[in-house]
Design a protein with these regions (language model features):
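Charged, alpha-helix-forming regions
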Residues: 1-322
Length: 322
């Protein structure tokens, strides 16, 4: 009787419908998905400097006696979390890998492969067992609206606080896996509080007419669209550039699309071919944004801002407004 009820509930999952996509824009989310963090049963504590006066302490650890598919948090995992949060914001309190795949691509009619579903499920099952605690007491005591009002403030949850339901139909053996939402993830509650959630019209993610939605293409286009949203919203940015690679002297680290999506440039032919492929996806994504009216225009820029085609393309300048 219990299995029958589960089957009926799963079979009646509502149709996914959303007008916006949401992306975590906090420094914490970037550090988690780009820095080597060993996940084990003890705390891995990160000191994340928001500015010269604010330091947040972030603890990350996994459940005991659990073997993860990977012992790190990847840009793909962050994209899965963003997609899950987008679904939650649409009012749904149950998730499926199929839904997340459609949100990731931005194409609700996309044909989802078994390989992609399995990759998303592995990511979800990993994120369900990783804890995060964000001690933002220092930040809250610096903010004008909460200064000297709160002595201690922490957010804590799993990276994706989800239950799991598995149902197999007797008639055809089809397996359905769904994930009921237990609570909003701490990383996103924190982002909401400090107004670091980027939102974009959902149709901007639909680029299937420009190129095929491989896992790599999805991560690249989401990076580009998020960066454009940051530029257009004037989120305290002094640059209108989408850069492949630049050095942040204040943070003493490499920034840009390459390091933030896990690419390691070298002098091999393989990397030169890969770089051309990445550039093509970036350029076609920007063309799609221009065609949809999200930006006015864009142009490539080269090393030292020269127009000489002998110098490598370093990224693109974005132009928007009237």
């Amino acid at each position: 009787m219990k299995n029958k009820k589960v089957n009926e509930n799963t079979e009646k999952l509502p149709v996914l419908n959303f007008n916006k996509q949401y992306m975590n824009n906090t420094k914490i989310s970037r550090i988690l998905s780009t820095k080597p963090i060993l996940l084990d049963e003890t705390y891995a504590q990160l000191r994340i400097e928001i500015n010269d006066k604010i330091i947040n302490l972030v603890d990350v650890w996994r459940d005991e006696n659990i073997t993860l598919s990977r012992d790190d948090i990847t840009p793909f995992d962050l994209a899965v979390m963003d997609a899950a949060y987008t679904i939650m914001c649409s009012g749904k309190m149950i998730l499926t890998a199929e839904w997340i795949a459609k949100v990731l691509s931005g194409n609700p009619k996309q044909k989802i492969t078994k390989k992609k579903i399995e990759a998303i499920r592995q990511s979800i099952d990993k994120l369900r067992y990783i804890h995060i605690q964000i001690d933002c007491s220092n930040e809250f005591n610096y903010r004008k609206d909460t200064k000297n009002k709160i002595s201690d403030f922490k957010y804590e949850s799993y990276l994706l606080p989800l239950d799991k339901i598995t149902a197999v139909y007797q008639s055809n053996g089809k397996e359905i896996i769904a994930y009921p939402v237990l609570s909003k993830p701490a990383l996103y509650r924190y982002a909401e509080t400090i107004h670091q959630i980027v939102d974009v019209p959902a149709d901007l993610l639909d680029t299937h007419e420009e190129y095929r939605d491989t896992d790599e293409a999805i991560l690249i286009k989401r990076y580009v669209i998020k960066r454009v949203a940051q530029i257009v919203s004037n989120n305290k940015l002094n640059s209108n550039k989408i850069s492949f690679l630049w050095y942040d002297r204040e943070e003493n680290e490499e920034r840009g699309l390459f390091p933030e999506l896990g690419y390691i440039p070298d002098n091999t032919r393989s990397w030169r071919n890969k770089k051309q492929k990445i550039n093509k996806i970036v350029k076609m994504t920007l063309k799609s944004l221009k065609d949809k009216g999200a930006i006015k225009s864009f142009e490539e820029y080269r090393e030292n801002d020269t127009k000489n085609p002998a110098f490598p393309i370093m990224g693109y300048k974005i132009f928007y407004g009237l």
